[in-house]
């Protein structure tokens, strides 16, 4: 039987938001929200890295929601410097939680989206996700106060040749963070995991 894929429009703060909801082939063990990269640099929910992360989560038994930030493809509104995009992600998360309130939550994101996921997951207020998966975390952004004193389990997955989050910058950053945390390096050609997308997907599956 083909898996269920539902196309949605969510009521976002700047207009409707385009989203996709995918259920796993097996009984669901959790839910996951996946945030895409920077909307002003071609980022969409159909980005190949986002797709692979979402696929890995679905294959490991998660109901997965992807969405487009305001102003991307069929989502209404305009870029809002990260703050509006964070609000968009919260709307998508609320919809996901309302549909599956009893399942444990994973937040995930790629590049700019990894910051959005971490900001949501590490914010005070009782969200308490099972974990946050930060793929291709960009160290070029220096405002990282949201990582301080974050007790949520965080998994960083990074290309060994990431030009926006190189080894020599990300390794000490993660080393300095409080537990629980994990850093997975993948031998890929660039920030977008060229030549290693299958390994990325398998790494997500192994997280369970």
Segments from the language model and where they lie:
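Short beta-strand/loop motif that positions the catalytic acidic residue
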Residues: 150-151, 155-158, 162
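Primarily recognizes the serine-hydrolase "nucleophile elbow" in alpha/beta-hydrolase
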Residues: 87-152
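Short alpha-helix in the alpha/beta-hydrolase fold that links the catalytic acid
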Residues: 152, 165-174
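Post-His helix in hydrolase/transferase enzymes
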Residues: 194-207
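Catalytic histidine neighborhood in serine/cysteine hydrolases
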Residues: 176-192
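Acidic catalytic loop of the alpha/beta-hydrolase fold
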Residues: 160-165, 191-192
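Serine-hydrolase catalytic machinery in alpha/beta-hydrolase-like enzymes
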Residues: 10-12, 16-102
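A domain-start/cap signature at the N-terminus of enzymes
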Residues: 1-8
């Amino acid at each position: 039987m083909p898996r269920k894929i539902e196309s949605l429009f969510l009521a976002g703060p700047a207009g409707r938001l385009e989203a996709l909801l995918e259920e796993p082939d097996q009984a669901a063990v959790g839910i996951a929200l996946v945030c895409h990269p920077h909307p002003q640099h071609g980022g969409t929910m159909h980005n190949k890295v986002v797709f692979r992360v979402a696929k890995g989560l679905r294959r490991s038994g998660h109901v997965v929601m992807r969405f487009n930030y305001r102003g991307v493809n069929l989502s209404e509104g305009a870029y809002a410097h990260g703050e509006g995009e964070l609000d968009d992600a919260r709307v998508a998360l609320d919809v996901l939680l309302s549909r599956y309130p009893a399942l444990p939550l994973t937040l995930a994101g790629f590049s700019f989206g990894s910051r959005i996921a971490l900001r949501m997951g590490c914010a005070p207020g009782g969200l308490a996700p099972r974990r946050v998966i930060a793929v291709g975390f960009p160290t070029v952004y220096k405002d990282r106060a949201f990582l301080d004193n974050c007790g949520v389990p965080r998994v960083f997955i990074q290309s060994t040749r990431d030009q926006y989050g190189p080894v020599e910058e990300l390794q000490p950053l993660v080393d300095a963070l409080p537990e629980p945390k994990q850093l997975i390096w993948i031998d890929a050609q660039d920030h977008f995991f060229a030549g290693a997308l299958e390994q990325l997907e398998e790494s997500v599956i192994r997280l369970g």
